[in-house]
Amino acid sequence: MGTGGRGRPTPGLNVYEVFLSLQGEGKFVGEPQAFVRFSGCNLRCAYCDEPASRSSRRRALIRRVSGEVELELPVPCGPEDVVEVLVELEDLEDTFGTVSLTGGEPLVQPWGALKELIERLRERGFRVLLETNASLPDRAPLIDELADVVSADVKLPSHGPNMDDFPDRCLRFLERISAEVYAKVVLVDEECYQHAESALKGLHRLGVEPIYLQPATGSEHDLEDLWELAGLVNADVRVLPQVHKLVDFIPR
């Protein structure tokens, strides 16, 4: 583990897995990236596609592009351990320059350890993409000067229990971000559309773009409804499903 202030050990990171793949969502879809998936999340979204990552593992699986497990890393682990693994993967595969921090929810990790990880990654020349549910506005200023790009998954009241105030919480989070940012809004069913309209207007007011309307995998949507929603505000709004669910390129 790393060392915090006054020589105290930095709490470790709950890493679920580290793997190489193509980005399947949002602005960088199709780009070769390394992914650090953390375990633990503050939400219980109905459409969550990685529910297993809510719970921690004793050992994080480190996978190559083929899906082959290269090694296992004891959890919790130090930031320097994660960086060392990524450097080894880069030497083996040499096809990625971006590290995506995903989950779970990265911002529930011990702050000192997450900060150190991002700093070490950037020192190594990696671009850092932070994927967050944007529901923890108090954490926004902490990561604003660290991550190169922030991907905000804006939550709607219909996404899960006790989420009525989450669109406002997400907007408060984004108000505190000056780094490059883009937003995703997942559409699960018809109930999402009314809430999505309000979210789009709020994102437009903040100048956040591009905005990706993401039909949930397996859900059904009317083209006219998607067309109308995408044209609601004068901004860069696109409809883009999870490509990695259409073409299974996440190693397992």
Curated annotation (Swiss-Prot):
Paired cysteines (S-S): none
One Pfam family of this chain: Fer4_12
Residues the record lists as binding [4Fe-4S] cluster: 41, 45, 48
Family annotation (Gene3D superfamilies): Aldolase class I (3.20.20.70)
Catalytic activity from the UniProt record: 6-carboxy-5,6,7,8-tetrahydropterin + H(+) = 7-carboxy-7-deazaguanine + NH4(+)
Molecular function (Gene Ontology), one example: 4 iron, 4 sulfur cluster binding
Family matches, as InterPro entries: 7-CO-7-deazaguanine_synth-like, Aldolase_TIM, rSAM
Described purpose of this protein according to its UniProt entry: Catalyzes the complex heterocyclic radical-mediated conversion of 6-carboxy-5,6,7,8-tetrahydropterin (CPH4) to 7-carboxy-7-deazaguanine (CDG), a step common to the biosynthetic pathways of all 7-deazapurine-containing compounds.
Record-stated family: Belongs to the radical SAM superfamily. 7-carboxy-7-deazaguanine synthase family.
Name listed for the protein in its UniProt record: 7-carboxy-7-deazaguanine synthase
Lineage, top ranks: Archaea, Methanobacteriati, Methanobacteriota, Methanomada group, Methanopyri
Underlying gene: queE
